[in-house]
Amino acid sequence: MESQQLSNYPHISHGSACASVTSKEVHTNQDPLDVSASKIQEYDKASTKANSQQTTTPASSAVPENPHHASPQPASVPPPQNGPYPQQCMMTQNQANPSGWSFYGHPSMIPYTPYQMSPMYFPPGPQSQFPQYPSSVGTPLSTPSPESGNTFTDSSSADSDMTSTKKYVRPPPMLTSPNDFPNWVKTYIKFLQNSNLGGIIPTVNGKPVRPITDDELTFLYNTFQIFAPSQFLPTWVKDILSVDYTDIMKILSKSIEKMQSDTQEANDIVTLANLQYNGSTPADAFETKVTNIIDRLNNNGIHINNKVACQLIMRGLSGEYKFLRYTRHRHLNMTVAELFLDIHAIYEEQQGSRNSKPNYRRNPSDEKNDSRSYTNTTKPKVIARNPQKTNNSKSKTARAHNVSTSNNSPSTDNDSISKSTTEPIQLNNKHDLHLGQKLTESTVNHTNHSDDELPGHLLLDSGASRTLIRSAHHIHSASSNPDINVVDAQKRNIPINAIGDLQFHFQDNTKTSIKVLHTPNIAYDLLSLNELAAVDITACFTKNVLERSDGTVLAPIVKYGDFYWVSKKYLLPSNISVPTINNVHTSESTRKYPYPFIHRMLAHANAQTIRYSLKNNTITYFNESDVDWSSAIDYQCPDCLIGKSTKHRHIKGSRLKYQNSYEPFQYLHTDIFGPVHNLPKSAPSYFISFTDETTKFRWVYPLHDRREDSILDVFTTILAFIKNQFQASVLVIQMDRGSEYTNRTLHKFLEKNGITPCYTTTADSRAHGVAERLNRTLLDDCRTQLQCSGLPNHLWFSAIEFSTIVRNSLASPKSKKSARQHAGLAGLDISTLLPFGQPVIVNDHNPNSKIHPRGIPGYALHPSRNSYGYIIYLPSLKKTVDTTNYVILQGKESRLDQFNYDALTFDEDLNRLTASYHSFIASNEIQESNDLNIESDHDFQSDIELHPEQPRNVLSKAVSPTDSTPPSTHTEDSKRVSKTNIRAPREVDPNISESNILPSKKRSSTPQISNIESTGSGGMHKLNVPLLAPMSQSNTHESSHASKSKDFRHSDSYSENETNHTNVPISSTGGTNNKTVPQISDQETEKRIIHRSPSIDASPPENNSSHNIVPIKTPTTVSEQNTEESIIADLPLPDLPPESPTEFPDPFKELPPINSRQTNSSLGGIGDSNAYTTINSKKRSLEDNETEIKVSRDTWNTKNMRSLEPPRSKKRIHLIAAVKAVKSIKPIRTTLRYDEAITYNKDIKEKEKYIEAYHKEVNQLLKMKTWDTDKYYDRKEIDPKRVINSMFIFNRKRDGTHKARFVARGDIQHPDTYDSGMQSNTVHHYALMTSLSLALDNNYYITQLDISSAYLYADIKEELYIRPPPHLGMNDKLIRLKKSLYGLKQSGANWYETIKSYLIKQCGMEEVRGWSCVFKNSQVTICLFVDDMILFSKDLNSNKRIIAKLKMQYDTKIINLGESDDEIQYDILGLEIKYQRGKYMKLGMENSLTEKIPKLNVPLNPNGRKLGAPGQPGLYINQQELELEEDDYKMKVHEMQKLIGLASYVGYKFRFDLLYYINTLAQHILFPSKQVLDMTYELIQFIWNTRDKQLIWHKSKPVKPTNKLVVISDASYGNQPYYKSQIGNIYLLNGKVIGGKSTKASLTCTSTTEAEIHAISESVPLLNNLSYLIQELDKKPITKGLLTDSKSTISIIISNNEEKFRNRFFGTKAMRLRDEVSGNHLHVCYIETKKNIADVMTKPLPIKTFKLLTNKWIH
């Protein structure tokens, strides 16, 4: 019997199988409460007899036979004897009898004396203590109550028995706790229903069906008082009774209301957890239903957030809606409303495909009605709690009492009071509850509890010889590590943590103690009946109590599910601390392996396959029970989600169904996959797979090409392998019709070997399903393995081979066996496997020297085919080796740095699993082996030396007063393996030779200098050089040694070519700042520098005056001092507080030379001549740090798990050379096609607007006679070169209007069809800004015009034809163009010539020379941008006259006449302008940016702290090797194009303060590394945060009527790649910033002065052109000024000495600058660096400095 019952429940873990021996009951579908009267009578007699025998004759005891169970036990058994409890005396599950009135007649069950009542309530006989039913009530159970919900169909015999014998019904249990009152009142109501008093029970509306009589009220009152003692009543019940102690009806009514509310909540939760939707009902109804449920739950205090609600809704979607699970599963912030928008879209698409009726949304009233109509359309599949019984004579089982006092314990004898519209769901276990659902009657299945545990109870077990418990809270006198061997029914060891005493305090106030074992590895807490019998305690299942031999009742027994339980409330808690026992060492052999670890170990196979494999022993070494499966259902492997993402499943059963049956290895499937691009030549590009039809055994072989001889070699190999290893001959090979299979060579080979080739039918790849599915599975595994391990892509075939080994060992759910078992091979020993990419250390048996490290970091790939070793990849050697000499490298950090979830580490599990294969390095000896020299065929990476030996440089401790970390060096001899880096390094393309990776040796003779620390914290690249060495306190004299005489401070004329050194500033967290560095002249610098070439003339020492003007001879009547003041006046320069002079300490007056070699692209101002951080500079202030965003940089740090190697020396490579096989980049499309805007547009309103715009465009085309409508041409008659494709494009303008445009495909236009010399001119942005500035100063009126369909006014000269759009139905016809259609190469130039001719001839305008599209006459100025015109004039009537002339020829619209004197708002060429004539003008783009930036999909942080500056000083763009797949590269380049394109548009329009950052990042569009993208995101975030900023202009108030044009220039020396300098200029007109420029110098400058000269020379041409434009538009005199903060540059401009120019390039630049300054009457002025607003154009600045320089003109 025991073995039979154990076999029925194999899934129960340790101890649970034993627990089912004596307490498990035969499975029945009958209600335990539903007991017929006849059986109660029989039971009463048998029970009375048994009780009387037990009372009078203790020496004998009999158990009545239970007619409900087929028990092999005899009806009577001997009484218990002294000593252990006999096994045959225990009540088995089949001997458990229902209990009746005699049970409740026991004195111990009625501790309270009944209240006095009428004698009619007492039955005959003085011993009865229970009330008798009044005669008016009738015989209990004789007729069912209509409200009870149960009907009984009794046989005639049953009727006679009921009428004659039944006098009592089963009463409710005693109320023992206020928390149990809700459950107790249900049983009490059931008791009243069974007593034919159901009519007096209040209904839902609070009123009974019939009035209650006095006798019934008395009966109600007394029974309530008996079974519900006052001390256990809830407070609200006591409050009712305090008012009227007889008002039991009110208590029942309120209880029913509470139960109804709880039932509704439970039903709502169950309905929400079991939603189903497939589109069969309207989406509106489904949405209304769900939202109503969520609203009700939220109103009742059960909050359902968006994430949980969306998961529940998506889980119930099926059919065409199922794909939403996959498209939406990564949207973490998705709302229910957004999800229903997608559901509505699919539903409307379905309806649209079924009929042509338009879809519409219903009004709210309709939705409410629908919610009632469709409430139960998705009713879950359930089993009703109390179905109606059809046969009352069937055997029933009595229900035991729930004596648990726990509020969370489920009630085992309560029924639902009323039914709800939604049936309760059946749960297999309590873990199926969702959303905090309580375990109520509506969720518990009382007929199947094989897996349920009754919380707070001990399970009675007669088969267990020892008591086992999981919690340590009740163990007394515990001792650890007991030497006890305990096994379960399957003979498996149960680990025991401790042994102690379990102490009981029973109802008779006696205390008893038994021995107990502590273990967490059991399903239930087991109470051994054998140990209870040893202390004279027996279990009486007749009365369901624990009692002593003298009959003393100790505790009730509760039957729950199939087992019997005793409450833990009788246990005495102990004072032992839980960690004392829980921390006891558990044997490693018994600890369960976590499922994620096994999932990764077995090549990321699914849980079902792994369980099948373990059950069938296809995977050996451990069993299914050794794995913790608790997380298998909900576990989501991110690597699987990424690596195995797919569009749809392959069609099942697509293989030929009627093929012949073959023996193993007679029928093979084969297919070739490839090629894999962008791999080194040594790596395979293809693989060929074979699958046996019968066993499903797989083989894979690498291929480098698909040539005939390569394929033939593989076929020869596998056929020989099958013949020798399996003694089988291949008969048929199925393959596709690729040329590699259909060639003559292979065909002859197959024919020679007697093999039949079976080819798939043409264009039917599905017929080749076996091979196709295998390739897909292997590729999914490959991507997942590479994603999880981080290994380089050229190891892809190793991942394929690892997956094949594991897949051959996993059991198939259909066959229940693995391919290895089918093939007759042993199962795979998992202890011989390592996770793919597992970091290991390989022993180097032949090191370079005796002191060289003996371990080489590597990554395990797969078991070797040719030995007992393992294939391991060694990144440092660029090869794979076959070896057994390795140890596993343990790491405690997250393996998956790309995901934001908990780290997974399995070091202990891996150690246990591979214990027999672990160590090869002993503490006293190292066993050397020659295995390392065995190179396998997996050596896919050629040997490239990327780590040349570098000289070691020792850094002095005095690097910086704030540096406390000692310097470190990285060399080849000091490599260390970081435990925090689990991922493998991404390798560079081995085909890139050393010559194009390493810097050219001819470029500089500077010795190589290794890094002193990695660039892990933000990309700072520090050099291993003695920046600051300790100096003597005394001043040293000048000597011939440069190392003792050079000053660390600024030297403008310092020559790198002659000294082989480069100035490098000291790094600081606060960026660069030179406010504490005193200015020194070139002469002073020259005195401190020895062995240098002759320099230029130096200026005399400068004073501390804020403005210094250099006198230049110019024909002006104004004094030079007044000219300087007039130029400086009104400029938006920052106001600086006075500063006290800073003195240098003596030790730093003389510093040694600084040697550096810097090639990084910088956002931090490397080598900046204008900003240095001195030795006594302070840290950045809180203002500088408060808005700094911490972004990850893909440099070598703890979060970058791509490398286990030390940081390499930075190597500059060409941007394009870093990307493999890069092709053309498609332009970004922002418009819609015809099918997108109209044909398949789901938005009905938008579609209608596009249709309206389409008809408007067609009418305009016909009106303008765009083509010849008189004749249509055949396509064959026209030269294809002259045929232009055409299409409609649609877009939505910023003002909300929808526009359609018919355009020609000019991108594919033949060059012979247009004149490449024609130009399409538009107004220059500087011209527009100049015109706007002059308009503000001169109180001009500004009028904005638009010419509709401007291009169509221009005739076309060439003979061109276009194809009509496809929807017009003229596919074979052509039409000849007559007008310049939009999109043609020549259309812009044709329109420009047309409008230019009209403005000059008809409007009396003339074009300003050198400034295209700027027209003027004596009164009006016009700026033309294609079809937009901006008119400026002092008299508004002048503008109106021009407008009238334009309307005579063109369809001209007045966008804004500009006649108001108040503030007027314009939208001119993307600029949002606020203009109040004579006062101010504000230029911004807030609305445009608010609309455009969110569409870029940039991770914005709108609620976080705002950035104070667009970038951080000291950050460098690390341009190491960039290895990306082509698709990934294109996607990132496209993203960079969009982001930098928008930033450039904003920067060159008005945000000139951003131009440096934009220009630097624009140089890296083709190098989209993670660091570049992070910096770009930071820039976009800053633009978003400051989108409301505006360029502010105020009307100037000059003393004299002159215009003042000023350029402020600056340069940062050598801070760009290849030592290029960054130059910047800002142009101001009358104190208003009208433009700016930031760019990298085209030539390499050799000093800061040369960089400043280059910057000034770049600004002068545009300054002269602007001067000419201003004089043409405004006839006032003009003063031109040039401001710089380089005094040495000023001295060069004014000097007449040409002897000291260091080279020809420098001299020619300087001489040209002198000529330009003198010839153009430029006033050159000095400006302090701290006031130089052009500083923002050349380097990133600290937040405080950035704000100081920009807040006067951008705010």
From Swiss-Prot:
Pfam families in UniProt: rve, RVT_2, TYA
Gene Ontology CC terms: cytoplasm; nucleus
Domain of life of the native organism: Eukaryota
Region (RNA-binding): 299-401
Primary localization class, coarse: cytoplasm
Basic and acidic residues composition bias: residue spans: 1038-1053
Biased composition (Low complexity): 153-165, 402-418, 960-969
Other information: Retrotransposons are mobile genetic entities that are able to replicate via an RNA intermediate and a reverse transcription step. In contrast to retroviruses, retrotransposons are non-infectious, lack an envelope and remain intracellular. Ty1 retrotransposons belong to the copia elements (pseudoviridae).
Entry protein name: Transposon Ty1-OR Gag-Pol polyprotein
